[in-house]
Amino acid sequence: MVDEQLEQIEGVVEDIIYENEDNGYVVFEISGGGVLTVVCGIVGELHAGESVICRGRYENHATYGRQFHAQECETDMP
């Protein structure tokens, strides 16, 4: 099996679209490099205005379109 590298994106959390407090699954938007990206995954608690670094893969959801599925996400401390 080939171990694929994860892509990395970073930016500022603009909006929390959905959050499941029971399992930590979050759908949110980040802006970075002039682009707004929808990110989803089990990443825990996030807040609008936080800078984040996420690693994962882009996927096309049949209903919601292109999303970044984060396998890891951490707050980028200044």
For the regions a protein language model found, what residue spans apply to each?
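Short aromatic-glycine-enriched beta-strand elements
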Residues: 18-30
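A cross-taxa feature marking solvent-exposed loop/turn segments within ectodomains of secreted
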Residues: 20-23, 47, 61-63
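Structural detector for short beta-strands of small beta-barrel domains
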Residues: 4-20, 56
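OB-fold/S1-family single-stranded nucleic acid-binding modules
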Residues: 27, 57-78
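Beta-strand/loop nucleic-acid-binding surfaces
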Residues: 27-47
